């Protein structure tokens, strides 16, 4: 497709330069603009596009397509947000002056290899649907204009069209839509004619009946997700959407939501790749201070993933989930690139005797001035038969329901296979509500088996109605495993603490935070990504506080936005 990316070949006659990512608003390059983070080229003659990094320490090919073109006019927010994430990641590389590594050098020597990964590829055909006419014929009107369907409803509908499920919905829903200033409701007890909904609606080539069927589906998805409709965009919460796909559309309750921030790049890519390999498109989301975005990942080629943006095929193509190599993921702290990205796994037709797939995670927090950061222990030397003690805090519930079940500390080998439990099983005395956290200090532990190279300690959990134990993972910066005996020094997990940024909330609801340098804006999010509050703090202050007494009890995310990057931490109210 693209034979070469050498500078002298970047203005070939059959390509069109359409955008340089050099500014906050992603404007077209001007003579006095700083070095762009990336360049976008369309292939005019045959179709397709390529996004090339403007930084040689980043991966060369950020995104490409051999069919669809990249249009910058009226660019949807989810695409703009993704490009901004590329730009932020590349800026972080430049700020810390990262040297070239061998892997990146080799990628730049032969970037065309990115486009020829046929032995490691998968593509699922999903609907090229949009948010406007004919998809929004049932959407509510505001000042006489139809609102868009919303990216969450569109992603839901694309998944449902692929599954061709449900046959008939169940029940009804009614809620108050703030932007519409009225109650919206509908019954889902209707037949969905999947064959009567084309995978692509081309102007002049679909019937009124086909338009009516898809717009009804979109509206039902919006009502199920409790969409907040607006003329400039409609929004909904992913967790609400998934819970109500289970409730109203007969999807399996084993579906679950994972956050990008809990995993390293290789593990995350493999999770998404395995889902697609198993013929399951992924609802993928991300958020920034301006809102949340949802789209579909329905394929991969090598390390690139095929994105259906839900805008009628606009800008669909293969995208890197990170502009950075795995070795560069720690550059600049957590940054905003992976911020609040999530993926919905296991969306499938309801199965008998299935159970919920609960998710527990570690997050950092303060309690009476003491910082808890996942797992910690009172020893650095482990001897078979000798007792030691561990702390485990905070453990947060990120499931689709309140958690009931058990916890235990386990010794596992270097392959992640459990050798033995080293603590008593902790049975939660009370239900752990969704969005709440709990801690367990001073847990007595003893290893009885022979200690081998690569052994480590994990905390495991099991739901009350499940048979399997799962590992508790955690946000970047938390300690999710304790190395008992080293095997490979590079395998030791170290907490990321590049800046002094922490927050705690007292019993009266007063939030106190230690801020990084140069904070321009502070945002409080719910755990599902909704922006609850935004503040502009005084410049150059190190400690900041505000009352959160009116917020309900739960886990919240505090985001600090600086000129260079964004930081986040969680706090419990």
What are the functions of these language-model segments?
Residues 15-18, 23-47, 243, 247-308, ...:
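Active-site-adjacent substructure of cysteine-protease-like catalytic cores
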Residues 446-454, 548-553:
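Surface-exposed, short loops/turns at beta-strand junctions within beta-sandwich domains
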Residues 341-367, 485-512:
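Residue-level detector of functionally pivotal "anchor" positions at catalytic/ligand-binding pockets or at interdomain
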Residues 428-445, 540-545:
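Aromatic sugar-binding surface patches on proteins
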Residues 58-234:
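Active-site-adjacent structural segments surrounding the nucleophilic cysteine of cysteine proteases
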Residues 465-489, 571-573:
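Short beta-strand elements
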Residues 3-19, 26, 32-34, 50, ...:
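Cys-His-centered catalytic/binding microenvironment captured across papain-like cysteine peptidases
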Residues 493-573:
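C-terminal outer-membrane/trafficking sorting elements
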């Amino acid at each position: 497709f693209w034979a070469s990316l050498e500078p002298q070949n970047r203005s070939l006659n059959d390509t069109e330069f359409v955008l340089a990512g050099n500014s906050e608003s992603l404007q077209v390059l001007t003579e006095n603009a700083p070095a762009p983070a990336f360049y976008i080229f369309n292939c005019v003659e045959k179709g397709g596009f390529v996004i090339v990094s403007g930084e040689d320490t980043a991966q060369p090919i950020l995104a490409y397509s051999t069919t669809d073109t990249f249009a910058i006019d009226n660019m949807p927010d989810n695409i703009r947000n993704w490009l901004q994430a590329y730009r932020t990641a590349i800026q972080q590389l430049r700020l810390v002056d990262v040297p070239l590594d061998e892997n990146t050098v080799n990628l730049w020597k032969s970037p065309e290899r990115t486009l020829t990964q046929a032995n490691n590829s998968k593509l699922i055909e999903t609907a090229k649907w949009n948010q406007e006419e004919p998809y929004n014929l049932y959407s509510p009107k505001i000042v006489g204009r139809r609102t868009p369907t919303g990216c969450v409803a569109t992603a839901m509908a694309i998944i449902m069209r692929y599954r061709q499920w449900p046959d008939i919905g169940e029940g009804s829903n009614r809620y108050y839509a703030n932007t519409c200033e009225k109650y919206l409701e509908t019954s889902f007890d209707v037949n969905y004619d999947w064959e009567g909904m084309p995978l692509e609606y081309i102007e002049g080539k679909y019937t009124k009946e086909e338009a009516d069927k898809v717009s009804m589906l979109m509206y039902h998805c919006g009502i199920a997700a409790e969409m907040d409709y607006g003329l400039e965009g409609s929004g909904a919460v992913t967790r609400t959407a998934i819970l109500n796909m289970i409730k109203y559309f007969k999807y399996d309750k084993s579906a679950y939501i994972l956050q990008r921030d809990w995993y390293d790049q290789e593990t995350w890519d493999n999770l998404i790749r395995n889902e697609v390999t198993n013929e399951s498109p992924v609802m993928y989301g991300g958020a920034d201070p301006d809102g949340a975005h949802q789209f579909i990942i329905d394929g991969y080629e090598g390390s690139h993933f095929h994105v259906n943006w839900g805008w009628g095929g606009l800008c669909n193509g293969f995208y890197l989930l990170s502009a950075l190599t795995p070795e560069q993921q720690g550059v600049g702290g957590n940054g905003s690139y992976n911020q609040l990205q999530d993926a919905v796994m296991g969306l499938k037709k309801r199965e008998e005797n299935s159970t919920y797939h609960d998710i527990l995670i570690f997050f950092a927090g303060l309690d009476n001035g003491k910082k808890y950061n996942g797992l910690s222990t009172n020893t650095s030397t482990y001897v078979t038969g000798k007792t030691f003690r561990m702390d485990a805090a905070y453990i947060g519930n990120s499931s689709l329901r309140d958690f009931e079940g058990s916890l235990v500390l386990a010794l596992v080998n270097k392959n992640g296979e459990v050798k033995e439990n080293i603590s008593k099983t902790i049975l939660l005395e009370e239900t752990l509500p969704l969005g709440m956290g709990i801690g367990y200090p001073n847990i007595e532990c003893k290893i009885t088996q022979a200690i081998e190279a690569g052994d480590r300690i994990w905390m495991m959990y099991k739901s009350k109605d499940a048979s399997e134990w799962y590992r508790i993972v955690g946000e970047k910066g938390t300690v999710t495993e304790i190395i008992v005996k080293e095997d490979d020094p590079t395998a030791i997990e170290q907490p990321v603490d590049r800046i002094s940024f922490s927050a705690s909330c007292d019993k009266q609801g007063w939030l106190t935070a230690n801020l990084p340098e140069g904070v321009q804006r502070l945002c409080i999010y719910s755990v599902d990504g909704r922006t609850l509050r935004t503040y502009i703090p005084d410049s150059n202050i190190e400690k900041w506080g505000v009352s959160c007494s009116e917020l309900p009890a739960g886990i919240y995310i505090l985001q600090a936005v600086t000129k260079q990057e964004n930081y986040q931490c969680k706090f419990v109210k």
